[in-house]
Amino acid sequence: MNKIIIVGAVAGGATCASQIRRLDKESEIIVFEKDRDMSFANCALPYYIGNVIEDRRKVLAYTPNQFYDKKQITVKTYHEVIQINDERQTVTVLNHQTNQTFEESYDTLILSPGASANRLNTHSDISFTVRNLEDTETIDTFITNTKAQRALVVGAGYISLEVLENLHHRGLDVTWIHRSTNINKLMDQDMNQPIIDEIEKRNITYRFNEEISHVNGHEVTFTSGKVENFDLIIEGVGTHPNSQFIKSSNVILNDKGYIPVNHNFQTNIPNIYALGDVITSHYRHVNLPAQVPLAWGAHRGASIIAEQLSGNSSIHFKGYLGNNIVKFFDYTLASVGIKPNELKNFDYDMVEVKQGAHAGYYPGNSPLHLRVYFEKDSRKLIRAAAVGKQGADKRIDVLSMAMMNNATVDDLTEFEVAYAPPYSHPKDLINLIGYKAQ
């Protein structure tokens, strides 16, 4: 019987445990989670802050007791793995409730410790990050108890944008700052203009090339010299992998602290696997490394690891496409493929179309901007981006499937659209991209 230890019990770890149990009813599975909660919906957290999702039970899928009762998997929360001895095949675990440590042996070790939010040096009682359910509940309680009215959001990634929208939805007066003009970095910068338009339409204050200098109580001094008072600060300034404890082992980390894995999600040590935000792998459609800390990859990794451990060695990870999407007020911004800063590795062309999301004569139409990048020689698709109030998600998902199948830009003329006036055009934007490229 295989004894499996899993480090981390959120998207990657909990899903991996479930998938293993689905295929293997006999092995002992123990999951260690350093925080309070397991199996919660990370992506729901900003909407919980905004009271868009009001019921905590909709965010939390399982408690440890429920997980054990349904799947016979032991989950120990407030238990942090602080050391790995891969030669003896043991982990050292710190019980945060008793402050005692103990060793646990394993046959197979699966690492899904995730990432932690970077922090500013504010040393402030009004400054928070949004990384887990505890963070979110703390922010929610703080806003309610202090009757917070003015909020400062720092950073311009997905979390910051979603929290900004949800704090505004909750009725707070929000100010947004970022240290540069490069926002929402997975999107082409000129296609981010709707973000600014939505901000200005709602009279939300924003400043780029701005940072916090220091915080004194509620008084925030900025690098520009401005001084303002806030009731709440949300820091969304990136993340770093929770891999410090792995340095005690022979598991290889790259220079940024991520774990390189192979097509089976194995580390350099065959009986140690890794998945989720802590890993780096490769793109599916181009020959480049890829670090994609998004939910799909964690779930795919969980399935592949489970298949491998059950003896199905024919299923492998074929790589990321980096498909991503964010809602910001009335707009959807989505992209797939390599990142904008990776285009420099290719000799490419770009084609774009700006057209209504569906037939112009049908009520409720709105503009949709679609852009596709392809290699000049092979004409293979390498990146696509879409922005609009309607239809951006559909087009990007179609192009994701096209990339998955190594389609060329010319193949897009053959895409057969599901056409009716409320949904599309007889000649869809994706078709037009193909025709324009010819």
Swiss-Prot record:
Broad class of enzyme this protein falls into: oxidoreductase
Residues given in the record as NADP(+) binding sites: 151-166
Flavoprotein among keywords: yes
SUPFAM superfamilies in alphabetical order: FAD/NAD(P)-binding domain (SSF51905), FAD/NAD-linked reductases, dimerisation (C-terminal) domain (SSF55424)
Cofactor note: Binds 1 FAD per subunit.
UniProt keyword list: FAD, Flavoprotein, NADP, Oxidoreductase, Redox-active center
Reported cofactor(s): FAD
EC number: 1.8.1.14
UniProt subunit comment: Homodimer.
Function: Catalyzes specifically the NADPH-dependent reduction of coenzyme A disulfide.
Domain notes: Contains 2 FAD binding domains and a single NADPH binding domain.
Additional information: Reduction of disulfides occurs by a thiol-disulfide exchange reaction, but involves only a single catalytic cysteine residue that forms a stable mixed disulfide with CoA during catalysis.
Family, as annotated: Belongs to the class-III pyridine nucleotide-disulfide oxidoreductase family.
Identification of the protein by name: Coenzyme A disulfide reductase
Organism: Staphylococcus epidermidis (strain ATCC 35984 / DSM 28319 / BCRC 17069 / CCUG 31568 / BM 3577 / RP62A)
Gene behind this protein: cdr
